[in-house]
Amino acid sequence: MSMYNYVKEAWKVPANSYVKELQWSRMQDWRKEPSVIRVERPTRIDRARNLGYKAKQGIVVVRVSVRRGGLRKPRPKHSKKPSTLGINKITMAKSIQRIAEERAAKKYPNLEVLNSYWVGQDGKQKWYEVILVDSCHPSIKSDKSYNWLCKGTHKGRATRGLTSAGKKGRGLMYKGKGAEKVRPSVRANSKKAK
């Protein structure tokens, strides 16, 4: 079994392997860091490489922390009946992973989101590592596995829901029975898909 398979097996159920102690010590530092921070190398090398990461110029890994649970809505200033306030029990139509990708893209506007993966969570927040690519870098333009990102059609792909997490949230991972209303888009079908 290769080294990557050992790492993959350990991360399948972190609570049953050495990953539990690693996460416990790492999260103490992560909580003190800003919500979006660039990291030198991926925490999960097996997952990162599986999603397209290579240790080369023009590719950056960023760790993003996002709150857990439902949407945190501000309380209306003017008085309302409690039943119509609309603060509690409101769930975002986007996944937390998708929010993490969008925040990373906003922090680094010259880079495009390639993919992302989960690295940890506690009671209050989740951490994701986002792989970003500089589409104007010469080493990316000359690499056949990345130069498709240099086309203008992929600009702002995280905010347009074109990443893997974005497509999953839009229901585009499914086809056939039960997926009749997800194409061409959720809004085109009057939001009947959600």
From Swiss-Prot:
Annotated segments matching region Disordered: 160-194
Any one GO molecular function term: structural constituent of ribosome
Gene3D superfamilies: Ribosomal protein l15e (3.40.1120.10)
GO biological process: cytoplasmic translation
One GO CC annotation: cytosolic large ribosomal subunit
InterPro entries linked: Rbsml_eL15_core_dom_sf, Ribosomal_eL15, Ribosomal_eL15_arc, Ribosomal_eL15_CS, Ribosomal_uL23/eL15/eS24_sf
Keywords in alphabetical order: Ribonucleoprotein, Ribosomal protein
Highest taxon of source: Archaea
Family per record: Belongs to the eukaryotic ribosomal protein eL15 family.
Protein name (Swiss-Prot/TrEMBL): Large ribosomal subunit protein eL15
Name of the gene encoding the protein in the UniProt record: rpl15e
